[in-house]
Amino acid sequence: MWGDRRISELVEPVVAALGYELVGVERLSSVGKGALLRIYIDTPSGITIDDCERASHQISALLDVEELMASAYTLEISSPGLNRPLFTEEHFKRFTGVEASITLSKPLNGRREFKGLLRGIRGDRVVILVAGEEFELPLEGIKKARLVPEC
């Protein structure tokens, strides 16, 4: 899982105890506004505002006790939504056959952006079919990945 691994490892048991799946964690910073910590949760039947509020109270208390955030931050609990972020190898396996957009940290063959059909996992690489050409992208090199909603 990329994103913030330390925070993910800390909040996953809390999220699971509430009956949710931790989809992933994103830590975003904005100059002058502090950090935004976005935590995605889900269940097979989806997530409601009440679910997000319930998780927010538990996670906020935990983060304050553990003092993982060095400065002021805003905590946002969210469902993954239609353009679901993909964080783990399991996510790429689960959504094989679905269109996704992947951004790499470093270019591969001169490009960082790939949008196409997920073909699964080979070893430690995500396989994606882009305009008839298959690419194998290193899992550890993925900066951001999301499903592309169907129109």
Curated annotation (Swiss-Prot):
It comes from Nitrosococcus oceani (strain ATCC 19707 / BCRC 17464 / JCM 30415 / NCIMB 11848 / C-107). GO terms for cellular component: cytosol. The lineage of its organism: Bacteria, Pseudomonadati, Pseudomonadota, Gammaproteobacteria, Chromatiales. GO terms for biological process: ribosomal small subunit assembly; translation. It is found in: Cytoplasm. This is Ribosome maturation factor RimP. It comes from the Bacteria. Its main location: cytoplasm. Keywords: Cytoplasm, Ribosome biogenesis. Belongs to the RimP family. NCBIfam families: PRK00092.1-1 (NF000927). InterPro entries: Ribosome_maturation_RimP, RimP_C, RimP_C_sf, RimP_N, RimP_N_sf. Signal peptide: none annotated. Required for maturation of 30S ribosomal subunits. Transmembrane segments: none annotated. The gene is rimP.
